[in-house]
């Protein structure tokens, strides 16, 4: 015996309905199902207050929801068996910690679907939000098994901390696809945003469309054909210990990435040369600010610098200072030629000067917003000087 649920009205307050599960409904009569508890805000109420519930003879362990449940969270959370069909849009955390069974949505879903799921299948015949198959905040281990299929587009941080399982996206994906991935496979048939595979140590990511930027921690290994497309395999992320991650991208759709591997034809525009900005804390920086004081000459000397590859340093005319600009902001930094920096990238110690360039996107399981940012780099003129930490705080409002 299956059941059909129809919302009685629009949900004014989000509902937490982790009791909508086929394995929990099994063996219960209609009155018992209507009495199952859900949370409206912080108040427990019976499920029957919000849904018309009827039996259907078509299938056992089936729940069909007809209507908009975009403000209902945790549907199918922890389910072990059975099937849920939703004809409408769905809210947050659909199928989180799911262990078995199947969920199919004929509509769009919000963020955090399939969080830390262990098994089963989630199929979305529409679009999905951020953090598909991701880890909970404060946790590093995401999806551990099962399969998520999204026929449309998906948002940022897909498969964050993923350990095993499969995620398939038929459309486009946002930034940081496969961040901190440690196993499993992600396939994106469309385009993806910046820095796919950031901090991944294992697993497979295949992107058949265009990516915005590639992190310098990925090394090209080989080129081959797959489904009629020429693909390139990269290994990484080499910024991690013993990385075994495999990132595949489409050759013909990512010539803008591959062209950065050579200085042939690179030109300096009015803005300068386009490079990829990365940042991170340094040991010296930690020693300086251990006492909590960042407003020192030593701090400026360590953090107000831009490490540049020898090729780009020479292309810019071996400058003393450079101007780095992004998103309408710019900062003057001391230029440092560094053979350890890959051509087409720069490194700025993470601090107040780096914060001027950091995009506002900060929703992540860590701090990858400091990686893979496209910026412009040019030689500073005589009148452009390095601002102190206090001046930057006053001008841009960046935190200390």
Curated annotation (Swiss-Prot):
* GO biological processes: methanogenesis, from carbon dioxide
Reactions it catalyzes: N-formylmethanofuran + 2 oxidized [2Fe-2S]-[ferredoxin] + H2O = methanofuran + 2 reduced [2Fe-2S]-[ferredoxin] + CO2 + H(+)
Pfam families per the record? Molydop_binding
What GO MF annotations does this protein's record show? formylmethanofuran dehydrogenase activity; molybdenum ion binding; molybdopterin cofactor binding
InterPro entries attached here?
Asp_de-COase-like_dom_sf, FmdC/FwdD_MopB-bd, Formylmethanofuran_DH_csu/dsu, Formylmethanofuran_DH_suC, Glu_synth_asu_C_sf, MoPterin_dinucl-bd_dom
The transmembrane segments are none
Q: Which organism is it from?
A: Methanothermobacter thermautotrophicus (strain ATCC 29096 / DSM 1053 / JCM 10044 / NBRC 100330 / Delta H) (Methanobacterium thermoautotrophicum)
The pathway this protein participates in, as annotated, is:
One-carbon metabolism; methanogenesis from CO(2); 5,10-methenyl-5,6,7,8-tetrahydromethanopterin from CO(2): step 1/3
Q: Does the keyword Manganese apply?
A: no
Report which gene this protein is encoded by.
fmdC
Which purpose does this protein serve, as stated in its record?
Answer: Catalyzes the reversible oxidation of CO(2) and methanofuran (MFR) to N-formylmethanofuran (CHO-MFR). Can only oxidize formylmethanofuran. This enzyme is oxygen-labile.
- Keywords of this entry: Methanogenesis, Oxidoreductase, Repeat
Write down what this protein is called. Molybdenum-containing formylmethanofuran dehydrogenase 1 subunit C
| Keyword match Oxidoreductase | yes
**Which NCBIfam families does the record associate with it?**
one_C_dehyd_C
Q: Which EC numbers characterise this protein's activity in its record?
A: 1.2.7.12
Q: Where is this region: 7 X 13 AA repeats of [GW]-X-X-M-X-X-G-X-I-X-[IV]-X-G?
A: 76-209
Activity regulation behaviour: Inactivated by cyanide.
Q: Which family does it belong to?
A: In the N-terminal section; belongs to the FwdC/FmdC family.
User: Which enzyme class, named as a word?
Assistant: oxidoreductase
Which regions does the record annotate with the repeat sequence?
76-88, 95-107, 114-126, 140-152, 159-171, 178-190, 197-209
Upregulating conditions: By growth on molybdenum, under anaerobic conditions.
What is known about its subunit structure?
A: Consists of five subunits; FmdA, FmdB, FmdC, FmdD, and FmdE.
């Amino acid at each position: 015996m299956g059941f059909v649920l129809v919302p009685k009205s629009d949900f004014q307050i989000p509902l937490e309905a982790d009791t909508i599960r086929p394995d929990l409904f099994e063996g219960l009569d209609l009155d018992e199902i209507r009495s199952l508890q859900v949370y409206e805000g912080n108040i427990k109420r019976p499920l029957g207050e919000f849904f018309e519930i009827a039996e259907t003879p078509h299938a056992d362990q089936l729940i069909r929801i007809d209507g908009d449940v975009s403000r209902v969270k945790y549907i199918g959370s922890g389910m072990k068996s059975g099937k849920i069909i939703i004809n409408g849009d769905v809210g947050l955390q659909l199928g989180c910690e799911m262990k078995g069974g199947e969920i199919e949505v004929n509509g769009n879903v919000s963020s955090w679907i399939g969080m830390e799921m262990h098994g089963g299948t989630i199929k979305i015949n529409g679009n999905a939000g951020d953090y598909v198959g991701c880890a909970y905040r404060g946790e590093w281990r995401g999806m551990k098994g099962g399969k998520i299929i999204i026929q449309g587009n998906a948002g940022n941080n897909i498969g964050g901390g993923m350990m095993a399982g499969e995620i398939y996206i038929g459309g486009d994906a946002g930034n940081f696809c496969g961040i901190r991935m440690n196993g499993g496979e992600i396939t994106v048939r469309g385009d993806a945003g910046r820095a796919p595979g950031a901090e991944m140590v294992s697993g497979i990511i295949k992107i058949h469309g265009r990516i915005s930027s590639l992190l310098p921690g990925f090394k090209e290994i080989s080129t081959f054909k797959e489904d009629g497309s020429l693909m390139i395999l990269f290994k990484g992320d080499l910024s991690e210990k013993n990385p075994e991650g495999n990132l595949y991208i489409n050759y013909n759709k990512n010539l803008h990435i591959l062209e950065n591997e050579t200085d042939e034809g690179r030109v300096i525009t009015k803005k300068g040369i386009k490079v990829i900005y990365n940042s991170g804390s340094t040991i010296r920086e930690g020693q300086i600010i251990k006492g909590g004081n960042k407003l020192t000459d030593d701090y400026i000397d360590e953090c107000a610098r831009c490490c540049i590859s020898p090729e780009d340093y020479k292309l810019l005319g071996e400058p003393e200072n450079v101007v780095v600009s992004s998103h309408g902001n710019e900062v003057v930094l001391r230029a440092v030629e560094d053979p350890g920096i890959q051509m087409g990238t720069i490194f700025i110690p993470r601090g107040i000067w780096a914060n001027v360039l950091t995009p506002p996107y900060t929703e992540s399981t860590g701090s990858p917003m400091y990686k893979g940012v496209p910026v412009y780099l040019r030689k500073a003129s005589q009148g452009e000087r390095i601002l102190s930490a206090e001046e930057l705080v006053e001008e841009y409002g960046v935190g200390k």
